[in-house]
Amino acid sequence: MNKIMIVEDSEDIRGLLQNYLEKYGYQTVVAADFTAVLDVFLREKPDVVLLDINLPAYDGYYWCRQIRQHSTSPIIFISARSGEMDQVMAIENGGDDYIEKPFSYDIVLAKIKSQIRRAYGEYAAKQGEKVVEYAGVQLFVERFELRFQDEKSELSKKESKLLEVLLERGEKVTSRDRLMEKTWDTDIFIDDNTLNVYITRLRKKLRELNAPVSIEAVRGEGYQLRAQS
C-alpha cells in the first residue's frame, strides 16, 4: 500500500483528500505541525508528497528544498496560485508536478498514480539509472534509496555517496581518507568524527532493513563490508 503525505493548511481540503485517497486504497499521513514538515517526512517515509505552497511559518518551496536534501520521492504541489512563475518556481525548487486549486480529485489521483509508476513501478530503474548491489542489498544512486527485498530506506545525499563507495568495494578495505574524499568532494577539512556519525547512521539503516550486510571497521586501515550468512 503506497503512502501519501498531505501538507495542506485547509482542514476541509486536507480531510477531503484523505477520504478520497483512502477510498482508493492509499495510506495517508498528515503534517499538522507546519514547523516540522521535514520531521514528519523522515519519520513516515511517504511514497508521494502533496504539498501546498501557502503554508504557515515556511512556504511549500522551503519544505520542498528541505525534503530534496534527503529524498527524491515525488512531490506534487497543489496550490491556488495559477501564475506561470509559480509553476516554474515549484519545479525549480524540486517539485515533480503542479495542480491548481480548485482541482478535480480524479486528476489528483491520476497524477499520483503517474508519479508512483515513474518512481517505483513500471517506469522505475530506467535504462542508465545506476544501481549498486552487494549481497542482495541495492542502492538506487540517483534516488538516494536503499533496498533489500521488499523494504526500502531513504538516504541523505552524503549517506548515499558513502554507501555507494562501500558497496562498490565490497569486502575490500577502503581507507577513511578515501571515503571522506569521495563523500564530501571538498578541500574543506572534515573532522574524523563526522565520518563516524555517517557510518553509524548507515549501520542503523542496514539493521532496520534486516539486510545481511554489515559495515566493519578495520583497525588502522578503514572500513569494509561483510556479508552475513
UniProtKB/Swiss-Prot annotation:
Subcellular location: Cytoplasm
Transmembrane regions listed in the UniProt entry: none
Post-translational modification: Phosphorylated by YxdK.
One of the GO biological process terms: regulation of DNA-templated transcription
Keyword DNA-binding: yes
Record GO cellular component, one term: protein-DNA complex
InterPro entries linked to this entry: CheY-like_superfamily, OmpR/PhoB-type_DNA-bd, Sig_transdc_resp-reg_C-effctor, Sig_transdc_resp-reg_receiver, WalR-like, WH-like_DNA-bd_sf
Record keywords: Activator, Cytoplasm, DNA-binding, Phosphoprotein, Transcription, Transcription regulation, Two-component regulatory system
Gene Ontology MF terms in the entry: phosphorelay response regulator activity; transcription cis-regulatory region binding
Regions annotated as coiled coil: none
DNA-binding region: 129-227
Role description: Probable member of the two-component regulatory system YxdK/YxdJ. Positively regulates the expression of the yxdLMyxeA operon by direct interaction with its promoter region. Could also indirectly regulate the expression of the dlt operon.
Protein name: Transcriptional regulatory protein YxdJ
Source organism (scientific name): Bacillus subtilis (strain 168)
